[in-house]
Amino acid sequence: MCIRDSSRNRTVIDVLYSTGCRVSELCDINISDIDLDEKYLKLKGKGSKQRIVPIGSMLYKNLLQYLNVRDTFLQNRGEPLFLSKSKNKLDRTAVFRIIKKTAKNISIQTDVHPHTLRHSAATHMLEGGCDLRTVQEFLGHSSVSTTQIYTKVTKEFLEEAFTESHPRS
């Protein structure tokens, strides 16, 4: 794998996890959707709804590195953020392959999909103390009941919450 592909793949995974975006939203990101000065990313969600998500420090670093590598390898600095080897917009199938290959390379035995990263982002935000309504906005859900489906509370988190908040713990 060349440096360009390695940087792209790392950034694809980071965008999926850091923003909790859907794979279709990832594929639709254009360079103009990124504001590195203000550190936010504009996503085009279901039903043509747009939402703004923050760019965290790790994603910021990976985006800068990827954009630098991308611009070095490509004469065409076209709009789509993620491009295939044939310089077309990266598609869903390619993203699934990137996730599967990366999981295999790091010896993850369970079945991993791009949506797994979305679920993980939501769960980790909740475990970190974020309220459900904020996670709903972050994920671009119109209903909080949809957000509840996406989240899993770990046994450890539940035990800790019980111990810290229940008077008879």
Region annotations inferred by a language model:
Residues 4-169:
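Conserved catalytic core of the tyrosine transesterase superfamily
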